[in-house]
């Protein structure tokens, strides 16, 4: 099974679009899109990881 990841190197960003591209985080929370997810990853100091693309 290949590990999936998201490149969050350009984050955090002050504002995210309302684009709907759900990402499920390791905290079992569904983030609306990559921007929302990556901002949360930065806030978590890297402890939050990607579980899967799509809703949890």
Swiss-Prot record:
Location(s), subcellular: Secreted
Pfam families in the record: Kazal_1
Residue span(s) of domain Kazal-like: 6-56
Site residues by UniProt (Reactive bond 3): 18-19
Name of the protein in its database record: Ovomucoid
GO molecular function: serine-type endopeptidase inhibitor activity
Domain text: Avian ovomucoid consists of three homologous, tandem Kazal family inhibitory domains.
């Amino acid at each position: 099974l290949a590990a999936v990841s998201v490149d969050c190197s350009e984050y955090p960003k002050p504002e995210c679009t309302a684009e709907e591209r759900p990402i499920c985080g390791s905290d079992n929370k569904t983030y609306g899109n990559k921007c929302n997810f990556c901002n949360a990853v930065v806030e978590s100091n890297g402890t939050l990881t990607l579980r899967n693309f799509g809703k949890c």
